[in-house]
Amino acid sequence: MCGKASSHGLSWSEVYAWAATLRAPKTLPADPASRRNISPSRLRRKAEPDSMVWETLPVIRATDDCDQPDDAIWPFIPPYSEGRLPHNKQGRLISTANARLRDDGAPFAPTFMGAWRANMRVLVAVSWFYEFDRRVRPQIPYAVFPLDAPCWLMAGIGRFTRMPDDSRKLTVAIITVAPNDVLTGVGHHRSP
């Protein structure tokens, strides 16, 4: 998955009517904002930490009473990076928008294992996601729509983080696997 998605026209009532096994809350919140080009949170200007643009994705997380719709900051913020995008030891940003499911050993990279062990799994609800054919220049974007559903419900892994304003926010990474034939056909190596 390339890291771009859409919540255009997403309706919680349609999602819960379609996914009948979800336990809807007594009152649904307002539908997610209709956005066509959501990408992971980023700094507008690398030299200015205050230029942070926090992006969110609509998610559904299990609570004791129901499967609750929510907004989650994208990408996942690991424990060692509380309230800010993660960096490596050299100070470069680390991409945590996607959690790659591994074929052997631990299911995910160590960054995601604490959330996995804590059972912080969510469903990420999007109208469509984008894939770019990286085999050609300029890259060609493809919007990948579900044919028989109101949205994609993608597996995600979440974690609550403390933000700079001292609030607690849910953050999310989309779980990716090897692509199916359709996504392989557009030149991509991972799939939600």
Across the structure, where does each feature detected by a protein language model lie?
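Short linear sequence motif anchored by a di-proline
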Residues: M1-P192
